[in-house]
Amino acid sequence: MDSTPYNIILLAGGTAPTLTDGTGVDEKASLTIHDQPMLQWVVNAFHHSPEAGNIVVVGSDNLDKLRCMQYVRKRITQGLSVVQNLLHAVGYVKARFYKGEPDHQGYIISFGDTVFLTPEIVTDTLRAIREADADIVLHYVERQTFVEAGLPAERTYIPIGGKEYTGTGIYYVRKFSKVFSSLNELVEMRKQRKDPKGILRVIGCEGEDFPAIEAALSARLDAKVRILISPHAGMGMDVDKPADYRLARKILPSPDTDEL
């Protein structure tokens, strides 16, 4: 099994007026928690994981002034859509790090607002992805995981196999050529992560269990799809609305100023 650290793509573009209005920043990724920009929390989590290698960020040149960018190999200017951003980032990683070779390790994709990730969560997750040995790996977190962690469980869940799950902020794709025709569907799954009916409609497996969903997605994408259940509540959390931002400021520790 290849043990080379994964190349990481962080999608950090876009604005969120409900979060940034009155803060003096235009972009969500620059919004601070304990005086540290959200993107810096995310870069820190990946930078300090032995399973993560090169980090590529997609976002505007406003991000260049952030201290964490010294640990980013390349910033790619955001395009007009998530699909375009992904294609630009994947194209860069394939050309720069994989030298255009068809056989490579694939791509880890995350987001500039996944501030609840830690190096430990990233390491466990990327090791699980490595062991899954699949073309596409998705993670979900069960509702009970939030309860046991003492975190608010009032979020949107997807009913699967008699339990309730929510999506996460780390995805793996081995080869985008295999999923290019269905890339819009994958993006739609991310977009619909807060809407159980919406994501089940995209998946097309309402009421089924995870093995059935894996089989359906594998057949649809002509790729080996694995769905893993993460034991980490932080995997199922991001900063998408003001309540998330308040929670982040409440539970995230004040960072060590020398951490990065």
Label the predicted regions.
Residues 1-24:
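N-terminal nucleotide-binding beta1-loop-alpha1 segment
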Residues 3-7, 36-105:
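Conserved N-terminal catalytic core of the sugar/cofactor nucleotidyltransferase
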Residues 17-48:
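Short, well-formed alpha-helical segments that are part of the catalytic scaffolds
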Residues 106-110:
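Short aromatic-hydrophobic micro-motifs that form the base-stacking/packing surface
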Residues 112-115:
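The conserved acidic donor/metal-binding loop of glycosyltransferases
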Residues 226-229, 238:
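Conserved active-site beta-strand element of glycosyltransferases/polysaccharide synthases
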